[in-house]
Swiss-Prot record:
It is a single-pass type II membrane protein. Keywords: Calcium, Disulfide bond, Endocytosis, Glycoprotein, Lectin, Mannose-binding, Membrane, Metal-binding, Receptor, Signal-anchor, Transmembrane, Transmembrane helix. It comes from Mus musculus (Mouse). Glycans are attached at residues 114, 129. It comes from the Eukaryota. Residues 1-54 are cytoplasmic. Disulfide bonds join 106-117, 134-226, 205-218. GO terms for cellular component: membrane. This is CD209 antigen-like protein D. Residues 112-227 form the C-type lectin domain.
Amino acid sequence: MSDSMESKTQQVVIPEDEECLMSGTRYSDISSRLQTKFGIKSLAEYTKQSRNPLVLQLLSFLFLAGLLLIILILVSKVPSSEVQNKIYQELMQLKAEVHDGLCQPCARDWTFFNGSCYFFSKSQRNWHNSTTACQELGAQLVIIETDEEQTFLQQTSKARGPTWMGLSDMHNEATWHWVDGSPLSPSFTRYWNRGEPNNVGDEDCAEFSGDGWNDLSCDKLLFWICKKVSTSSCTTK
């Protein structure tokens, strides 16, 4: 084969549409130089062949570095144990508040205090009718069992006005009993107002009056308080 024929065989023909400028050098010139020096027909092929182990290692390093950065960012957003405990306490407090708001230990118009429900009347009746009204509500005219309860009821009644309690001596003068038949505890006699009970005018029923107790005619019309034990599980958390 002649030298001219061999030269034509080795010559690479590059289409005109591949001729473009890259950093001031024509694409065709670069392709020709690659073909002459390395026997590569195009720049794309050169790019593929340039993927040596060093390049792959560099790419792997960059990938791992990026992954580590993402992990660090995610870990930094996780709350510390102290913050988690604070969040837990706030959630428990919120739960308790929601529980209290949704769970009612007493029926509507009744007031809860120390495990019992109290109904404070808005109307006035005599002592006997007040006792009957409480029974119709499934309760009793209030029986006082503790000093805390006495303080609570006395303060509430003082703001409302004279109020009946479930205490009388109608069956035996000067011997006071509650509506359930139990006797008045001697420790509670200190709650009588000074000079009371005096039984003036056949006063056989007890009322909350001012800062203490007073005996009064059972026919008088007063407010009244009913009491019953709360049976709701809401009373305990």
